[in-house]
Amino acid sequence: TFNNITQGVMKENIRQLRTASHELEAARDKWKRYRRKEIVGMRRLDYLQAVEKNTWFHLGSNNLTQIFYCLKRMLEPSLEHVDNNFNPLPKVDIIEFTPICEEVDAMLVRTRKMVDSGDFTGADEVLVEGNSLKKRLSEIRHSQQDHLQHEEENIRATLLYLNMLQETQEFISMIRHLVRASKRFQE
């Protein structure tokens, strides 16, 4: 979904953004059903074990919910921007953002493999990588904020790009927290 949102904005593809919207809603509904089943399953654990697992389960659950909201906050302005045929993102911004999107996608793939398999041996590397990505995004975001103060022609596109940078940074934070909570839950 993250990939569909970012690619949809960069390529001005409304269909890709609408697909991301449907995927996001389906994933959120699936997560709600899964969470209910997990809560019922937690009742069958030993009391002391359930207390510890319950904390990490709810932290992970809250992180996943925040990931959904983060993607939605990224999607809605992007969908509006592309649907209304506003000026596209400048090529410079697309060139700057593309490698970050690729790194985030790679991080998502590794995180998903870890969570699905329950093997968190590479968790520390993902956390370090996420931290360095957040720092890079912060630097780009600050330069965009400075750029916004001096630019007057393409403010909507710059604000959209700034929103995408901020939400990507928040998205990475939530992924890092999810990895940590999942690792502790599996222990």
Where are the regions a protein language model picked out?
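Cytosolic, long alpha-helical scaffolding segments
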Residues: T1-E187
